[in-house]
Amino acid sequence: MKKFVAVLSAAAMMTSLAACGYTADTANTAASSAETTASAAESTADTAAADSYKVAIVQQLDHASLDEIRVAIEKELDAKAAEKGITIEYKDFNGQNDATTLNQIGTQVVADGYDAIIPIATLAAQCMTTAAESTKTPVIYAAISDPAAADLTDIDYVTGTSDALNTQSIMDMMFAVQPDIQTVGLLYSNSEANSTTPIAEAKAYLDAKGIAYVEKTGNTNDEIMTAASSMVGQVDAVFTPTDNVVMAAAAAVSETLTKGGIPFYTGADSFVTAGAFATCGVNYTELGTYTADMALDILETGVVPAYHVMDGGIITVNTETAAALGIDYSAFNDLAGQVVEATTAE
């Protein structure tokens, strides 16, 4: 565009100068010189553009897991910018778990010409993918448990990181320390794509063992709290996958279940630092860092790779919750290469 404008300016200059007695040769020389200058300016602009990127970070809603990922992304972008001597401008957006708001953010981000979009969590990723369809702006999502189920695969401008849950590992943990379980509670949001596959896997696991289960769902904090409270006295343990809706109420849910003597097994370590008993999942700081690296590599190379599944073999236990429940979790040492002890965050 800059070159086109410069050439038009040179042509206008030729017409004006011809009226002042310039010959065609003189005019051609002037046009050639102007075009050369325009090419040099364009080259300089391209170089400057390659050294500067604008990135939109779109968080689905506020809660500990997604906050941890966002902070890790920002830190890594800052570190890589300093290391490479480039400028990476990023701006945070928050959809408050509302599809309309997220769609508006997507429209704004694309219109503002961001070079890449990093959505955190499934609904944010779906909305950003739709918004970027016409421009093919790279979308590098973070923490999508099942990209295929979320319809985020086989799209040439979309990739990212998956925190796919190993549901069997969490179920194995449950029965390792509570071998006499009779009934398991399954607490989740039926609007969360992240929960669909692991809940189905949990049911299949429990059916195979002949263990009963009680399902409770909700789509707001109040509904989740009501569901959790109703499980007290009905179940011996509760399982929640990487469910963003439940995570938003994790502290209150954990407190309610612990007071009721019910261990709360979850899909992410951020639940555990909110008071849940234990998890076997990914490290979200590592996931955020990897996502940022993917985004920068795509910006620099233009190559969009397949999505990456993070290693989730880390067991995290809340020692305060374990003590309150009177549970000996030493059996976890036989199930994972690493057992991390944590306490409830203030």
Named regions from a protein language model:
Residues 18-38:
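Bacterial lipoprotein signal-peptidase II cleavage site
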Residues 297-346:
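Hinge/cleft segment of the Venus flytrap/periplasmic-binding protein
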Residues 97-115, 127-130, 223-236:
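Short, well-structured alpha-helical segments in soluble
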Residues 127, 131-167, 266-278, 343:
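Flexible loop/hinge segments that line or gate small-molecule binding clefts
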Residues 147-153, 159-182, 282-302:
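Hydrophobic alpha-helical segments within soluble ligand-binding/sensing domains
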Residues 56-58, 110-122, 140, 184-187, ...:
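Periplasmic-binding protein-like
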Residues 55, 73, 163-206, 306-324:
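An alpha-beta-alpha
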Residues 49-75, 80, 91-100, 191, ...:
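Extracytoplasmic "Venus flytrap"
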